[in-house]
Amino acid sequence: MPPQVLDFSDVVVRRNARNIVDHVDWTVHDDERWVVLGPNGAGKTTILQLADTLLHPTSGIVTIFGERLGRSDVFELRPRIGFASSAMARRVPPEETVVNVVMTAAYSVLGRWNEAYEDIDERRALRVLAEWRLDHLVDRTFGTLSEGEQKRVQIAR
């Protein structure tokens, strides 16, 4: 069986005396793709925030790439996690160029600040954009892209 990339074991997330996620067990293997569906307020976003290391469980164990959340450096895990959503698109600075959106993924940030990037970072981003046939958008700002283009840039990221 392919290796586990994500494992939830009896995971609970509690807010304001209410379980948002209630004793969830879930395993994702390397060769699997999942869709998370449910009504508003069911905990879908919370589950994805756990998987993206943006949130820790109240109880239970979340393991990502064999690393237990809470016992591992999330800043080392995050570059290995790909995540695309409308919520993430809203967090990308609209004035950020497409090449920067893709380039900053290697550092688990959404948008450039004052960090210095190396030539290899830009070459890698340009290569990925070309592979996804998005190289014509390199100098466009993220906020000027259509929703479909934004999603493709996030996936390339």
Predicted region positions:
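Conserved structural motif at the start of ABC-family nucleotide-binding domains
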Residues: 6, 20-23, 138
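Conserved hydrophobic segment flanking the Walker A/P-loop of ABC-type ATPase nucleotide-binding domains
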Residues: 28-30
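The feature captures the beta-strand-to-loop junction immediately N-terminal to the Walker
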Residues: 37-39
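Conserved ABC transporter NBD signature motif
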Residues: 60-70, 77
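ABC ATPase nucleotide-binding domain "signature motif"
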Residues: 146-152
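Hydrophobic anchor residue at the start of the ABC signature
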Residues: 155
